[in-house]
Regions:
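N-terminal extracellular ligand-recognition/capping segment immediately after the signal peptide
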Residues: 10-63, 69-81
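Long, contiguous C-terminal flanking segments immediately downstream of a protein's structured core
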Residues: 1-4, 22-31, 67, 182-189
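Surface-exposed or flexible loop/turn and strand-edge residues in extracellular/cell-surface modules
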Residues: 3, 37, 51-53, 59-61, ...
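Short glycine/acidic-rich loop motifs that flank beta-strands on beta-rich extracellular proteins
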Residues: 29-31, 47-53, 73-75, 79, ...
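Predominantly polar beta-repeat domains that present long G/T/S/D/N-rich surfaces used to bind, process
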Residues: 3, 101, 131, 136, ...
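Feature marks extracellular polysaccharide-active and adherence modules
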Residues: 43, 65-70, 77, 104-107, ...
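Parallel beta-helix/beta-solenoid
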Residues: 65, 89-112, 127-138
């Protein structure tokens, strides 16, 4: 394995995993053109709890994936989020590229997050950021970040072979979906 591959297993505490993913997020969330790449891989099992959720922010050049045969083999009680990027011109998701999420289940648990962030799992991306074989339960999946400086723009992505209840499209300009189940789509006109 390369030096930037992190493999987690259910015997690790949420605090141990959080320390690693938070350190990577601190480096990668705004590292748009940096050369670093990370893979955060989860062995089959359950991570986080309702009282101590695992919250993962996915930055540039970061892959988050479950290593089970099925998305239900890896369950994260918490969030796996992408938020708007803020700079002198405002807070938007138009350059949230180069990250991915695959082959796991997110049971949304929001203890410790503010009211707006607790409202759902955020995947505010704009292209080159696929979500494949992901189940989202216990809350909404939102494809825009309406918490950081109010609703702002995002510009598309790809979701395939996934199951989720309610999806908030919001300001997304375009999103390609394929073979998704139990999907209820809410536009944000």
């Amino acid at each position: 394995l390369g030096p930037n591959v992190r493999i987690f297993d259910p015997s690790m505490s949420t605090a141990q995993i959080r320390a690693v993913v938070d350190q990577i997020a601190a480096q990668q969330v705004s590292n748009e053109f940096g050369p670093e790449r990370y893979a955060l891989l989860f062995k089959p099992g359950t991570y986080g709890t309702a009282d101590d959720p695992l919250i993962v922010q996915v930055g540039y050049g970061t892959e988050v994936a479950g290593l089970g045969a099925s998305p239900t083999d890896v369950k994260i009680n918490g969030h796996v989020d992408v938020y708007n990027q803020c700079n002198a011109n405002g807070c938007i998701a138009l350059t949230n590229f180069w990250r991915s999420l695959s082959n796991l289940t997110i049971q949304i648990e929001s203890k410790g997050l503010d009211g707006c962030r607790a409202s759902g799992n955020f995947w505010a991306v704009s292209q080159a950021a696929p979500m494949r074989r992901v189940n989202v339960t216990g809350g909404n999946l939102t494809l825009m970040d309406y918490c950081t400086a109010g609703p702002q723009y995002a510009s598309g992505g790809f979701i395939a072979d996934s199951a989720m209840g309610f999806v908030i499209n919001g300001s997304q300009q375009q999103f390609l979906t394929r073979e998704n189940f139990k999907l209820r789509w809410e536009r944000g006109d």
